[in-house]
């Protein structure tokens, strides 16, 4: 089976947005107009094609990023649907890792909201070219020009406006196309599938001319010859203008801005045209970078069917009919059904079936090519973020980074039968979602699950009950505190055990230093002259790492520190890897005891949107929760309050906020950083948790 479209006609993109910016509805309309979906599914009726997990249909929020393939203007579009709720930033992060371009959707009333800023920064991190789609212009209070200003003020981006809305709120009926200088009007009776062109309305002619001039000025900056011609009075034609806008978008010089109302079926075809015109193809992206595992040298793969095979597994899902599916982005080479691959873990994996996914239906395929996003069935060892590559020419692509969980709770199975099922369920869920961790409390024997927020854990517990039929008692959520060394310390620690026969001996000299926040655990080996044989060094690192993970003060992990191993001693007979591991464990405990431990807590960035009359109450309440107000800002007839608040003081906040604002305020919150717990609170915690 040959490739259906040449690589330059591929567009791998995602739609990223705040929770209610209409992302799923936009994807639905794209599937409808590209001919894949014959009945439009509305999110608020719980029928959207992309939202295929039961919990998503009930809650009306997108949780898992399903990948879908469709076609437009003889181009092949692979769309990755990303969730907008803050507890699922991990899903967005892994989608961005495998996308070539992104459409940022904004609510036409609110403009750029806090979660939009987070996702935008994630896209900056991966260097993803993007464009903006200002949606919901049919809503009361929608203001396109205000939204464009928020793109400048809150994201620091340079907007290149391509379309202006005709009419606003309930009068919104079409767009002014600035590139082709015409108006586009949609026919409501055809569900937006039909539209016609007409002249730009007379009352918008001046505004259209002003915005078109701005657009041309931005575009000609991309090319000296075009700039010279423009300065001499020659305007670029539509084709030249598009080429210049494409060049600038791919170079991150500006972001094209479109608008519409997906719900009212206006503007989606213009969005699809812009994806084809301005979003990158896999050939516009730099070669994917990695490391050759045989030599440890940097290596790369060109985007080509002829290059050795390389791919990244970016999502694992359990499908009720096929079993475990590994969603994979192929960067180079080709893949056939039944072929063997090498995974990062140096294990051979056989590809059972290869599926092209439409939101919840699937098509079996025999071959896949560079640039494709496919689901593979039958992989046993591969987890999220792993590289798959050809056996003869291995490469390890850069791994994804996953944030540490900030909240935890205990789960106890109700019966013996549930216990076995729960083990299987939790392992499967953890394989799907790297920001979800499972551990056992050594003292109580309880199973502890950890995640990125209350909703995150609530949905996972819900899935455990529904998909795996596990009945369990769930404890109250607890904050995931961390411990941190108060100062640097130099240690000389010996472990010695002589009791007849072979003894145990290990001695290490180390400098243990607290690191920058977020630096993690760093181990440096500077042993000279073989004072400790090389084969024992990994055991020493393991001893420090594992002891730090169990904590010292009240049993929370010690984070962000460096261990510099500079000297030590060993015994020809009595030394072993185990002896040095035990020695390192003792040294870590001694370091914690002598350096002293500070307690750290997760601090959340909270944004509350409230009507003016409740502003005082909202600020007073945040202050009472040990919060620090960062600023307030007027949004239409409401106020947006931004604050940093300890997670420990945010449990149950939603109910209290609703009660004192009569349900008129809403908020969003996401993890920002760890900070030291004040002394009086730390004392209370020690008494409670010790």
Swiss-Prot record:
The portions of this protein that span the membrane are none
List GO molecular-function terms, semicolon-separated: GTP binding; GTPase activity; translation elongation factor activity
Family annotation (InterPro entries): EF-G-like_DII, EFG_II, EFG_III, EFG_III/V, EFG_IV, EFG_V, EFG_V-like, G_TR_CS
Q: Where is the tr-type G domain?
A: 8-283
Q: Give the range the annotation lists for the signal sequence.
A: none
Q: Where in the cell is it found?
A: Cytoplasm
Instruction: Please tell me where GTP binds in this chain.
Output: 17-24, 81-85, 135-138
PROSITE patterns hit by this protein: G_TR_1, G_TR_2
Keywords linked to the UniProt accession? Cytoplasm, Elongation factor, GTP-binding, Nucleotide-binding, Protein biosynthesis
Q: Which NCBIfam families match?
A: EF-G, PRK12740.1-5, small_GTP
What this protein is called in its record is Elongation factor G
Organism annotation: Novosphingobium aromaticivorans (strain ATCC 700278 / DSM 12444 / CCUG 56034 / CIP 105152 / NBRC 16084 / F199)
| Origin organism lineage | Bacteria, Pseudomonadati, Pseudomonadota, Alphaproteobacteria, Sphingomonadales
